[in-house]
């Protein structure tokens, strides 16, 4: 059995790490490189960095901090933010990133996934999906440009349909960002994750809702995800990654422990 992964997420805006609740009201929580180094030291399996305002502004992630992170940490990391071409992806990988992630640009041009797949290989291409649950209709739908509340918009995609499409295009991994759960620390959306898991043949990362160590155990056991992503519980020191991993081992979950 492959070990489950713990993945801290660092949302970056104007050169600082920020965190919001349900993708709104972002506050500064720290500097990029020191936080990245701290999480690597605590035992994170990999890191994800989202330049959350890049796509909404028509910009691309600031590559200067990518190289600084690569110099400081020795675990894999993934970078997202306005990547629209293979050339832009190549530059970010050259600066030291191990994977690139696309979200809004893929919604604008789904064939971008295939082009990145053909250029760099499936294992390098992650697709982030910002999924919103509409209680009125009971539908899960995909939002675009969520890094800027004023720019966020609906798309024509239902979440499960988009999950199937990004796999058809060749993505190597999916991060399901559950917008309703983001930052509220009430647990992952197991019901939605199970629906996605049933049609997802690539590694699936759960994002949105972690508040306790038990929430991580629950999402691994009940939703059968490959990795759990979280932000505020790590940024605010609510959960230590090393202690979390020890807890998960005690629950019988396969996890990589650091020495």
UniProtKB/Swiss-Prot annotation:
An annotated GO cellular component: cytoplasm
Subcellular location(s) of the protein? Cytoplasm
Q: Which InterPro entries match?
A: Aldolase_TIM, His_biosynth, HisF, IGPS_HisA/HisF, RibuloseP-bd_barrel
The EC class name is: lyase
Tell me which EC number(s) this protein carries: 4.3.2.10
Catalytic activity entry: 5-[(5-phospho-1-deoxy-D-ribulos-1-ylimino)methylamino]-1-(5-phospho-beta-D-ribosyl)imidazole-4-carboxamide + L-glutamine = D-erythro-1-(imidazol-4-yl)glycerol 3-phosphate + 5-amino-1-(5-phospho-beta-D-ribosyl)imidazole-4-carboxamide + L-glutamate + H(+)
Q: Which UniProt keywords apply?
A: Amino-acid biosynthesis, Cytoplasm, Histidine biosynthesis, Lyase
Tell whether Lyase is among the UniProt keywords. yes
- Which residues constitute the catalytic centre? 11, 130
* Annotated pathway: Amino-acid biosynthesis; L-histidine biosynthesis; L-histidine from 5-phospho-alpha-D-ribose 1-diphosphate: step 5/9
Q: Which GO terms describe its molecular function?
A: imidazoleglycerol-phosphate synthase activity; lyase activity
Pfam families found in the cross-reference section: His_biosynth
Cite a single GO BP annotation. Answer: L-histidine biosynthetic process
The UniProt similarity line reads: Belongs to the HisA/HisF family.
What the entry lists under HAMAP family is as follows: HisF (MF_01013)
PANTHER family (UniProt xref): IMIDAZOLE GLYCEROL PHOSPHATE SYNTHASE HISHF, IMIDAZOLE GLYCEROL PHOSPHATE SYNTHASE SUBUNIT HISF/H IGP SYNTHASE SUBUNIT HISF/H
Quaternary data: Heterodimer of HisH and HisF.
* NCBIfam families linked to this entry: hisF
Q: Give the protein name, as stated in the record.
A: Imidazole glycerol phosphate synthase subunit HisF
The species this protein belongs to is Shewanella amazonensis (strain ATCC BAA-1098 / SB2B)
């Amino acid at each position: 059995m492959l070990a489950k992964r713990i993945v801290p997420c660092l949302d970056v805006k104007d050169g600082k790490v920020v965190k919001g609740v349900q993708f709104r009201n972002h506050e500064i929580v720290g500097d990029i490189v020191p936080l990245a180094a701290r999480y690597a030291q605590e035992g994170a399996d990999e890191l994800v960095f989202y330049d959350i305002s890049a796509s909404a502004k028509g910009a691309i992630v600031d590559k200067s901090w990518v190289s600084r992170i690569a110099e400081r940490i020795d675990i894999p990391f993934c970078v997202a933010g306005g990547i629209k071409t293979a050339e832009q992806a190549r530059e970010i990988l050259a600066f030291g990133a191990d994977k690139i992630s696309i979200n809004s640009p893929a919604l604008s041009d789904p064939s971008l996934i295939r082009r990145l797949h053909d250029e760099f290989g499936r294992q390098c291409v992650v697709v982030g999906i910002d999924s919103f649950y509409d209680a009125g209709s009971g539908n899960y739908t995909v939002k675009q440009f969520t890094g800027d509340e004023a720019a966020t918009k609906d798309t024509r995609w239902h979440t499960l349909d988009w999950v199937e499409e990004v796999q058809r295009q060749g993505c190597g991994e999916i991060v399901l960002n559950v917008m309703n759960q983001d930052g509220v620390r009430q647990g992952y959306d197991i019901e939605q994750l199970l629906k996605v898991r049933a049609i997802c043949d690539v590694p699936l990362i759960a994002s949105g809702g972690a508040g306790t160590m038990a929430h991580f155990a629950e999402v691994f056991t009940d939703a059968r995800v490959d990795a759990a992503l979280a932000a505020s519980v790590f940024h605010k020191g609510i959960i230590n990654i090393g202690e979390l991993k020890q807890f998960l081992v005690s629950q019988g979950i396969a996890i990589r422990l650091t020495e």
